[in-house]
Amino acid sequence: MSLGIKEHPDAEVQKNRVLTLDDWQDKWVTRHIAFHQEQGHQLLKKHFDTFLKGQSGLRVFFPLCGKAIEMKWFADRGHTVVGVEISEIGIREFFAEQNLSYTEEPLTEIAGAKVFKSSSGNISLYCCSIFDLPRANIGKFDRIWDRGALVAVNPGDRDRYADIILSLLRKGYHYLLVVLSYDPTKHTGPPFYVPDAELKKLFGTKCNMQCLEEVDALEERHKTWGVDYFFEKLYLLTEK
């Protein structure tokens, strides 16, 4: 369903906005985590079967995973989940809130990084920057669920981010991606506005891109930012 969302002419206005890893860790410390969705994402629920295509034993990647409960949805269905998150608080809260026992160990490839693994063995969460992750050799993935990652990455880092994502995709992949549309002159981000033209630049040469759905996602907290519209657009990216 198309809502006829127009591209904003001032898409470049956020391009120099930068948040550091410390800024993101501080959000967890100060509990500024409105981006976390307690019930999981409704668009993923709706398109879950389409995304999985009835396949079993998939490897699923969650970039900038936080404590997303959707990770357990996949694990409970027998899939292997790997996430990356800079905040150790977020990772520990995921395991605590989902009542999962886990182990933790340092990552020798990345100074100061750790990997947390569920005792069942099918959830592994890496506590490090996603830009350091390639050194951990985590393998390739059949599915990627990206609800709050591309829209959180500094606009100047999107090319690097896309390169990492593309390097993690296995033949026959499905990459499900949510981007946001709002007036970027009213809110500095994050989350950032990602126009369609930017998506095509990042992924269009390697991926087929299909917009599955556009939804009006305006909440009161968005209005406090000064924006008067806020749309989510769900894309499915597949192999060309």
UniProtKB/Swiss-Prot annotation:
One of its GO terms (cellular component) is cytoplasm. Disulfide bonds: none annotated. It is found in: Cytoplasm. It catalyses: S-adenosyl-L-methionine + a thiopurine = S-adenosyl-L-homocysteine + a thiopurine S-methylether; mercaptopurine + S-adenosyl-L-methionine = 6-methylthiopurine + S-adenosyl-L-homocysteine + H(+). Its EC number is 2.1.1.67. One of its GO terms (biological process) is response to testosterone. PROSITE patterns: SAM_MT_TPMT. GO terms for molecular function: S-adenosyl-L-methionine binding; thiopurine S-methyltransferase activity. Substrate binds at F35. It comes from the Eukaryota. The modification N6-acetyllysine is found at K53. Keywords: Acetylation, Cytoplasm, Methyltransferase, S-adenosyl-L-methionine, Transferase. S-adenosyl-L-methionine binds at residues 24-35, 64, 85, 129-130, 147. Monomer. Belongs to the class I-like SAM-binding methyltransferase superfamily. TPMT family. Catalyzes the S-methylation of thiopurine drugs such as 6-mercaptopurine (also called mercaptopurine, 6-MP or its brand name Purinethol) using S-adenosyl-L-methionine as the methyl donor. TPMT activity modulates the cytotoxic effects of thiopurine prodrugs. A natural substrate for this enzyme has yet to be identified. This is Thiopurine S-methyltransferase. It comes from Rattus norvegicus. The gene is Tpmt.
